[in-house]
UniProtKB/Swiss-Prot annotation:
Name of the gene encoding the protein in the UniProt record: RPS3A
GO MF: structural constituent of ribosome
UniProt main location, coarse: cytoplasm
Cited InterPro entries: Ribosomal_eS1, Ribosomal_eS1_CS, Ribosomal_eS1_euk
Organism: Taeniopygia guttata (Zebra finch)
Keywords recorded for this protein, A-Z: Cytoplasm, Nucleus, Ribonucleoprotein, Ribosomal protein
Record protein name field: Small ribosomal subunit protein eS1
Biological process according to GO: ribosomal small subunit biogenesis; translation
């Protein structure tokens, strides 16, 4: 047997040598996430994405990202049990411009409302806004004791439940069908739809804790940058200077020519 060096061991250098560890965060950039103008607090956080390399563009990795934000953080309100989903639709500079993508109630709020001795009434409906967004709205409500009621339970009859459900669907359809997405979101923030349902159903059976508990985005129209910029309060007069930036008109005599400068 020929005595010689094992070439396979010497080829790769020192056996068991460690690979050079590259920090993955050195290849990433931070982007600001901007909420639409309907909300009080516009800057909701930051997100990471790998820098543009060859054909892999950073902005493509950001588009379509969904952020779930509590209404407390969007409106600077301590008591808020609604969560809004915002989806990135465009990237401008280091800013991700988002649009409404859905809404939900927090789990603890939902569980705190479900109790014994009352009837829970739920309804859902698919509605299209005036600007072409197809939404599915889910509503929930609970029966409550009438004034001076002695009986412990407050159960509604099946016929009353059907009437209330019909009313819920009518009001949700009416409120969404006649408005665009921006106006619908403005109604969802204080939940004025739930309050309208509560008032309308008072004659059938008194209700309490009536909320639009969930909103799903089913279909969207074709993306338009102009509409997104309007949502972020930058549409229309985006190119016009405002306030101090606007210049003042200077009066010139007819046939005025500027003097020739000696050096530029």
């Amino acid at each position: 047997m020929a005595v010689g060096k094992n070439k396979r061991l010497t080829k790769g250098g020192k056996k068991g040598a460690k690979k050079k560890v590259v920090d993955p965060f050195s290849k990433k950039d931070w982007y600001d996430v901007k909420a639409p103008a309907m909300f009080n607090i516009r800057n909701i956080g930051k997100t990471l994405v790998t820098r543009t390399q060859g054909t892999k563009i950073a902005s493509d990795g950001l588009k379509g990202r969904v952020f779930e934000v509590s209404l407390a953080d969007l409106q600077n309100d301590e008591v808020a049990f609604r969560k809004f989903k915002l989806i990135t639709e465009d990237v401008q500079g280091k800013n991700c411009l988002t649009n409404f993508h859905g809404m939900d109630l927090t789990r603890d709020k939902m569980c705190s409302m479900v109790k014994k001795w009352q009837t829970m009434i739920e309804a859902h409906v698919d509605v299209k806004t005036t600007d072409g967004y197809l939404l599915r709205l889910f509503c929930v409500g609970f029966t409550k004791k009438r004034n001076n009621q002695i009986r412990k339970t407050s159960y509604a009859q099946h016929q009353q439940v059907r009437q209330i459900r019909k009313k819920m669907m009518e009001i949700m359809t009416r409120e969404v069908q006649t408005n665009d997405l921006k106006e619908v979101v403005n109604k969802l923030i204080p939940d004025s739809i739930g309050k309208d349902i509560e008032k309308a159903c008072q004659s059938i059976y008194p209700l309490h804790d009536v909320y639009v508990r969930k909103v799903k985005m089913l279909k969207k129209p074709k993306f338009e940058l102009g509409k997104l910029m309007e949502l972020h309060g930058e549409g229309g007069g985006a190119g016009k200077p405002s306030g101090d930036e606007a210049g003042t008109k200077v009066e010139r005599a007819d046939g005025y020519e500027p003097p020739v400068q000696e050096s530029v």
